[in-house]
C-alpha cells in the first residue's frame, strides 16, 4: 500500500513564477561576475602548469621571469606557509590543508597534467603570460597511473609517498588507496546462496567535467593592515574565506570575500584554485590587487571533475522478483589527492531498494588526474548507473515489468539504507506510481524507423538533502518593502526562491522584496550553495526571520 499525503496548495506566493530579482541585470549585462572585477591599481596573474602527468620537480629557475620589465612578483610553493593536516569546510565536503596547498601549487611533485608549479603577477595579461613562459622547471618523469586497476596493482608507482591509507581501520603506507570502508548487515553469502537468480556485472566510467560557462577566477588584495579582500566565482563565499585563511595561516577574520555573480558551478566551484595565490602575489607586489581568470583548456584539464572509476555490482533475487541480497565494490578515482565522492556513493548505491542483506565496500583511489570535485549529487550518478543497469538485466531475465519490479522492492519508511540509516518518510513509491500511470510511460512508441532503435526506460536514484547553517536578515522599510540580506550564492534564482518563502509569511508580493548577498563581514555564516540545501536551509532561515518580523510588527 502506497501512503498518500495532503499537500497545501493555497499559497499566494510559493508555487508561482515571478520575475527573478537578478534577471534584469543578467540579461542586460549589468551583473558583475568575477571576470568583471576592476579595482584601482589592478595587475594580472598567470600560472605555469606542468606538461607532464606524473613527475618529480628537481628545480625551478624563476630568474628570467623576475628580471622582466612589468613583472611585480613570482611565486612558488616555497612562498606558502607550512600547512598542517587540519581540515576546513569546502561546501559539500572538507579540505585537508596540507594536501590542498600542494594541489593548488605543486611542491616536490606534479600529480597531473596542468598541475600549477609557479605563478607571476605583472602589469598586464600579456606580460604575465610571457613571464610564465620564461620560468624553467627541471622534471624527473615518473610512470603515470591512469586508472584504478593500475593504481591498485602490487607494483604500482606511488603518487603520494607520505600518504597513510585507512583500509578498514588499519593504517597502511606505500599505497594509492587513501581509504577503504565497508557497510554490511545481514548474512550476505547465505542470502545469495538462497537466491533463484544472481547477476554480477562490472561497469566503468570516466571522469566528467561540470562544464560551467564561466571559468574559475579570483581577485585578491593583501593590504598593509594584514587584511585580505577577495572577489571570486564561488558557490560559497564562506568556504573561500576558510580555505584561503587556512592555506595562508591567518585567522578567518582577516579575510573578507565579496560576492560576485556565478556563471554556473554544479559542485565544481566549492574549492579554491586562485584566491590564496592571488593574495600571496598581492603581498609580494606591495599590496596591489592581483586578478586571475582561468583559460578554458585549464578549466577542463586541471580543475575538479566528477570521479571516474569502476563499480562491481552483484544482486540476488528470488523467483517472485524480490531482491534478496546485494554486494558492491565502489572504486572511484580521487585524482592526484585523496577525496573522491565514494563516501556519498556508498550511501546512495543501494538506497532506493529494500534489501535484507547487503555489503558495500568503497575505495578512494589516487590516479594521475586532477583532484576530483562534486558534480550534481556527487557519487550518486556513478552508483545509479551500476545498480540500475543490473536491475534492468534482472527484469529482462525474469520477464518482469521494470516499474513494477522497482515498486515491489522500493525503499519506504522504515527501510534500512545500505549504510545502516533507517528511513523516515520517502516518496519513492509515489514517484514510481506516478510514472507508471503517466502518459509518458503508457503512450505508444510509434513506428521505429529503419536503422533506428526506439525505447523507453525507467530508473531510480537517490540523493540526500544537505543541512548546515544559513543566515537571513529581513528589514521592513517605511514604504512596506523588505530589504533581505542572505548569504547563499545565487545559483538558479535562489535569491527569489528564498524571498518567496519570507513573502508568503509576511503576506506581501515577492516583488516588494529587495534581496542582496553581502560580503562575509556583513552577514552571518552561510554554507555553500550545493548539496541540495539552499532553498530549504536558507529558505528556512528566511521563514524563521519572517515569523519573527511578523511578531515584532504585531507588538
Residue positions per predicted region:
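Short, surface-exposed loop/turn segments at secondary-structure boundaries that line and modulate
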Residues: 75-115, 150-163, 239, 257-277, ...
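Helix-loop-helix junctions that connect adjacent transmembrane helices in secondary transporters/permeases
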Residues: 158-248, 410-481, 500
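Intrinsic disorder at enzyme termini
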Residues: 1-29, 417, 432-449, 473-477, ...
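Glycine-rich loop/linker segments at domain edges
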Residues: 16, 21-28, 92-100, 170-218, ...
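Phosphate/diphosphate-binding loops
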Residues: 116, 123-124, 285-336, 540-555
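Flexible hinge/switch segments at interdomain interfaces of large molecular machines
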Residues: 34-43, 213-216, 358-369, 469, ...
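Alpha-helical support elements that line or immediately flank enzyme active sites
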Residues: 47-81, 118-139, 217-285, 342-347, ...
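Flexible, low-hydrophobicity surface segments
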Residues: 1-172, 198-201
Amino acid at each position: 500500500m502506497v501512503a498518500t499525503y495532503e499537500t497545501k496548495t493555497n499559497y499566494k506566493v510559493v508555487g508561482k513564477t515571478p520575475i527573478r530579482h537578478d534577471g534584469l541585470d543578467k540579461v542586460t549585462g549589468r551583473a558583475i561576475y568575477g571576470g568583471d572585477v576592476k579595482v584601482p591599481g589592478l595587475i594580472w596573474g598567470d600560472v605555469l602548469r606542468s606538461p607532464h602527468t606524473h613527475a618529480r620537480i628537481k628545480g625551478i629557475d624563476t630568474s628570467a621571469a623576475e628580471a622582466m620589465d612589468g613583472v611585480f612578483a613570482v611565486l612558488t610553493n616555497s612562498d606558502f606557509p607550512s600547512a598542517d593536516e587540519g581540515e576546513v569546510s569546502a561546501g559539500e565536503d572538507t579540505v585537508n590543508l596540507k594536501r590542498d596547498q600542494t594541489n593548488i601549487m605543486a611542491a616536490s611533485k606534479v600529480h597531473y597534467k596542468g598541475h600549477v608549479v609557479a605563478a607571476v603577477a605583472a602589469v598586464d595579461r600579456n606580460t604575465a603570460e610571457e613571464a610564465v613562459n620564461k620560468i624553467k622547471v627541471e622534471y624527473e618523469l615518473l610512470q603515470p597511473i591512469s586508472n584504478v586497476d593500475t593504481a591498485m596493482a602490487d607494483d604500482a608507482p606511488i603518487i603520494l609517498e607520505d600518504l597513510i591509507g585507512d583500509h578498514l581501520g588499519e593504517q597502511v603506507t606505500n599505497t594509492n588507496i587513501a581509504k577503504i570502508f565497508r557497510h554490511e548487515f545481514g548474512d550476505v553469502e547465505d542470502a545469495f546462496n538462497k537466491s533463484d537468480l544472481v547477476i554480477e556485472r562490472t561497469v566503468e566510467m570516466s571522469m566528467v567535467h561540470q562544464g560551467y560557462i564561466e571559468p574559475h577566477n579570483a581577485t585578491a588584495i593583501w593590504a598593509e593592515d594584514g587584511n585580505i579582500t577577495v572577489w571570486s566565482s564561488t558557490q560559497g563565499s564562506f568556504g573561500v574565506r576558510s580555505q584561503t585563511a587556512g592555506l595562508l595561516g591567518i585567522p578567518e577574520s582577516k579575510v573578507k570575500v565579496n560576492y560576485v555573480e556565478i556563471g554556473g558551478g554544479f559542485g565544481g566551484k566549492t574549492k579554491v584554485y586562485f584566491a590564496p595565490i592571488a593574495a600571496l602575489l598581492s603581498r609580494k607586489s606591495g599590496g596591489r590587487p592581483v586578478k586571475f581568470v582561468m583559460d578554458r583548456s585549464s578549466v577542463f584539464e586541471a580543475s575538479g571533475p566528477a570521479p571516474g572509476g569502476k563499480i562491481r555490482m552483484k544482486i540476488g533475487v528470488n523467483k517472485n522478483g524480490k531482491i534478496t541480497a546485494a554486494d558492491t565494490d565502489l572504486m572511484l578515482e580521487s585524482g592526484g589527492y585523496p577525496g573522491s565522492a565514494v563516501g556519498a556513493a556508498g550511501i546512495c548505491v543501494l538506497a532506493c531498494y529494500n534489501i535484507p542483506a547487503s555489503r558495500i565496500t568503497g575505495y578512494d583511489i589516487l590516479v594521475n588526474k586532477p583532484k576530483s570535485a562534486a558534480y550534481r549529487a556527487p557519487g550518486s550518478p556513478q552508483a545509479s548507473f551500476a545498480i540500475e543497469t543490473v536491475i534492468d538485466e534482472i527484469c529482462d531475465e525474469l520477464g518482469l515489468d521494470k516499474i513494477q519490479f522497482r515498486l515491489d522492492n522500493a525503499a519506504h519508511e522504515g527501510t534500512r539504507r545500505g549504510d545502516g540509516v533507517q528511513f523516515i518518510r520517502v516518496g519513492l513509491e509515489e514517484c514510481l506510481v506516478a510514472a507508471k500511470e503517466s502518459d509518458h510511460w503508457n503512450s505508444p512508441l510509434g513506428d521505429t524507423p529503419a536503422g533506428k532503435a526506439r525505447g523507453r526506460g525507467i530508473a531510480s536514484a537517490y540523493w540526500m538533502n544537505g543541512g548546515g547553517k544559513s543566515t537571513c536578515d529581513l528589514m521592513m522599510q517605511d514604504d512596506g518593502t523588505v530589504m533581505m540580506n542572505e548569504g547563499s550564492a545565487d545559483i538558479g534564482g535562489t535569491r527569489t526562491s528564498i524571498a518567496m518563502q519570507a513573502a508568503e509569511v509576511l503576506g506581501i508580493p515577492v516583488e516588494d522584496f529587495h534581496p542582496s548577498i553581502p560580503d562575509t563581514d556583513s552577514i552571518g555564516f552561510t554554507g555553500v550553495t550545493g548539496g541540495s540545501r539552499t532553498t530549504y536551509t536558507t529558505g528556512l532561515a528566511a521563514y524563521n526571520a519572517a515569523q519573527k518580523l511578523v511578531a515584532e510588527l504585531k507588538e
